[in-house]
């Protein structure tokens, strides 16, 4: 029987690089992934016409993250909310059992506004849009430990609620003019997948 091999020695540069990579992997940890901390409440807002890929993909990633973290408790608690208890998705599937838009959101939390079909997002007079926009104005995500995350054209709802004032933002490649109309004092960054402000 041979002795177990010693782990390879790492140079100071390799060690620093490994720490940086480990730190990058834990980027969301700044708000709830530390051991013993509160889980992050993640509110996916799903009005009519929501693109399933825009919320199901991120929700699955967070669910998977919960399974990979220590078993004590999840880092993310997922909530699916909307003005109505059921919402017709982008592909015609009805998403039911949605919770109402909460009256308050306490930190740590994320509010995720997802993209929608072009027909759903273009109606300025839409009742559901007005309810979501009024709700966003009340709960003011993006402040006091409640992060605002917009996916694709979900940025248009945040812009309509006035949440992008003097912010650096992006949206779906087909919507920069609409974003500029709704948030004229925001800095819209075109042709970007991410804009962090």
How does the language model describe each region?
Residues 1-148, 157-160, 190:
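Extended, subdomain-level signal for the structured scaffold at the beginning of enzyme domains
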Residues 151-155, 173:
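Alpha-helix N-cap/helix-start capping motif
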């Amino acid at each position: 029987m041979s002795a177990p091999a010693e782990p390879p020695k790492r140079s100071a540069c390799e060690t620093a690089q490994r720490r940086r990579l480990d730190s990058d992997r834990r980027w969301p940890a700044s708000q709830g992934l530390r051991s013993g901390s509160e889980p992050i409440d993640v509110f996916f807002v799903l009005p009519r016409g929501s693109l399933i890929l825009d919320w199901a993909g991120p929700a699955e990633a967070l669910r998977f993250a919960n399974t990979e973290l220590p078993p004590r408790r999840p880092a993310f608690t997922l909530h699916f909310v909307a003005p109505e208890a059921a919402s017709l998705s982008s592909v015609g599937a009805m998403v039911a059992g949605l919770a109402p838009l909460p009256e308050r959101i306490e930190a740590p939390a994320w509010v995720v506004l997802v993209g929608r079909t072009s027909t759903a997002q273009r109606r300025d007079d839409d009742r559901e849009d007005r309810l979501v926009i009024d709700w966003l104005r009340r709960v003011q995500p993006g402040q006091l430990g409640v992060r605002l995350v917009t996916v694709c054209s979900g940025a248009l709802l945040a812009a309509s609620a006035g949440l992008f004032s003097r912010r650096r933002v992006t949206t779906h490649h087909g919507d920069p003019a609409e974003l500029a109309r709704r948030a004229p004092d925001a800095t819209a960054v075109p042709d970007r997948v991410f804009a962090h402000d």
